[in-house]
Amino acid sequence: MEIFSVDWTGQTPPHIPRKSLPRHVAVVMDGNGRWANQRNLPRIEGHKAGESALIDVVAGAVQVGVPYLSLYVFSTENWLRAPDEVRFLLRFTRDVIARRRELFAHWGVRVRWSGVPNRLGKVLVKELRDTEEITKKNTAMNLNVCLNYGSRQEIVNAIKSIVSDVNSGLISAKSVNEKIISRRMYMPDFPDVDLFLRSSGENRMSNFMLWQSAYAELIFMSKLWPDFRRDDFWAALRAYSGRSRRFGR
C-alpha cells in the first residue's frame, strides 16, 4: 500500500503498529442535524459543516495507513426525511463528489460506491461512476461511499442472486455457505469490518454493514459529526488497538 506525500496540516499521526490497525473501518457519520439545532441553524447547515469532517477523517485514514474505509453517506431510510432535506442531501452529495474527487485522486484514494441507483437520478449516478473510473488505479486507500445503502436490502439482494443461480443450476443449494453469501455483497473484495465507529453518542448500528460487522469492535463517540476530526478518528484507532478481539469465541 502506497502512502502519498500530502500536506497534512502539520498533524502527526499516532504510531500504531500495522498489525494493530483495523483493515476495514465503517463509520456512521451522525449528528449533523443536532449540530445545526444547537446553533439555531437549518439542518442543511449541519450537513454542509459535515463535509469538513469527512475530508479530515479520510485524510487521517490515509495518513495512518487504514486500507479500507466505508462511510454511511445516505441510507435507504433517509428517504423518509422531509423532501426538502432529501433533495438538498442528494444535490449536496453530488456536488461534494464532483468537488473533491481530484483531491481524493491526489491522495491516492480509490473511491467506490455501495448502494442502489433507484431514485438517485442520472446526474448523481454519473458522478459516482465517473469518480470510480477516475480513481480506479489508486492504491493508498479504498473509500467505500455508501449512498442509498441499506444492509438488509444488500443481504436480500445477495440471497436473490444465490437463489437465481441455484434455480439455474449454476450452484447447488448444499454448496451455499458464508463465503458465497459474502461474495454477493456490494463490495465482495472488501474484508469484513474490524472497527465500527459512530459519532454523536448514539449507540446503534442503523442498518449499516450488518453482515460484514458480525465480529467488529464497536466504538461510539459522543462528538457530533461536524466537530469530528482526524484526532478523534485516531483516538478510536488507539482504543481499537488496545482491545483483545474474540471473534465470537
Swiss-Prot record:
Cofactor(s) the protein needs: Mg(2+)
Broad class of enzyme this protein falls into: transferase
PROSITE patterns: UPP_SYNTHASE
Coiled-coil regions listed: none
GO MF, one annotated term: ditrans,polycis-undecaprenyl-diphosphate synthase [(2E,6E)-farnesyl-diphosphate specific] activity
Full protein name: Isoprenyl transferase 1
Binding site for Mg(2+): D30, E217
Organism, scientific name: Tropheryma whipplei (strain Twist)
Residue sites binding substrate per the record: 31-35, 43, 47, 75-77, 79, 81, 198, 204-206
Biological processes annotated in GO: polyprenol biosynthetic process
Active site (record annotation): D30, N78
Gene3D superfamilies, A to Z: Decaprenyl diphosphate synthase-like (3.40.1180.10)
Family: Belongs to the UPP synthase family.
UniProt subunit comment: Homodimer.
Keyword Magnesium among UniProt keywords: yes
Function: Catalyzes the condensation of isopentenyl diphosphate (IPP) with allylic pyrophosphates generating different type of terpenoids.
Cofactor note: Binds 2 magnesium ions per subunit.
Pfam family, one: Prenyltransf
Cellular compartments per GO CC: cytosol; plasma membrane
InterPro entries attached to this UniProt entry: UPP_synth-like, UPP_synth-like_CS, UPP_synth-like_sf
Transmembrane segments: none
UniProt KW keywords: Magnesium, Metal-binding, Transferase
Keyword Transferase belongs to the record: yes
EC number, as in UniProt: 2.5.1.-
